[in-house]
């Protein structure tokens, strides 16, 4: 056996590792219910993105990976429309729950307003004095 370390993980190394991990996980999970991106985007009349949400289905869960709203339209309901639409699509695809994480300077109050509840807060992440919050919602 040989142990190596690198700062430059190659696509091939990543794929080799993930192939092994997926094979192991397949013993316990229905991988057909994993994957499948959900993308919801709001654009202006010129096609410029005003906001968007990208999530992925993982079993019975919608994992919200990214949510962004342009500063000029924050507070106008765009974020709420994005998340509501993603939740509806996730329900249609069989999801029963949603999970999102956010850092203290981001959008915890927004998610709580949408019905999400904090399950855990990781202190001093990514830096001293900040927190990473994990929130869930029953769909």
Predicted regions and their residues:
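Short hydrophobic/aromatic beta-strand element in the GNAT-like acyltransferase core
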Residues: 37-41, 52, 66, 132
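Conserved catalytic-core motifs of GNAT/GCN5-like acyltransferases
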Residues: 99-101, 117-134
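Conserved active-site tyrosine of GNAT-family acetyltransferases
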Residues: 17, 111-112, 116
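Conserved N-terminal entry element of GNAT/NAT acetyltransferase domains
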Residues: 1-9, 137
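Conserved acetyl-CoA-binding loop-helix of GNAT-fold acetyltransferases
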Residues: 75-88, 113
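A short, internal acetyl-CoA/4′-phosphopantetheine-binding micro-motif in the GNAT/acyltransferase core
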Residues: 67-74
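A conserved beta-strand-loop-helix scaffold within acyl/acetyltransferase catalytic domains
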Residues: 31-32, 44-46, 53-62, 67
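Conserved GNAT acetyl-CoA-binding A-motif
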Residues: 90-103
């Amino acid at each position: 056996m040989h142990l190596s370390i690198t700062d430059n993980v190659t696509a091939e190394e990543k794929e080799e590792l993930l192939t092994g991990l997926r094979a192991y996980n397949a013993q316990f999970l229905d991988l057909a219910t994993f994957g499948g991106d959900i993308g919801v985007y709001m654009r202006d009349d010129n096609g410029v993105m005003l906001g968007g949400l990208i999530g992925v289905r993982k079993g019975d869960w919608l994992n919200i990976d990214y949510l962004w709203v342009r500063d000029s339209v924050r507070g106008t309901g765009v974020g709420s429309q994005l998340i509501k639409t993603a939740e509806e699509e996730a329900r249609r695809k069989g999801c029963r729950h949603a999970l999102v994480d956010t850092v203290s300077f981001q959008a915890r109050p927004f998610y709580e307003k949408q019905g999400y509840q904090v399950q855990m807060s990781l202190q001093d992440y990514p830096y001293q004095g900040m927190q990473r919050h994990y929130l869930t919602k029953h769909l």
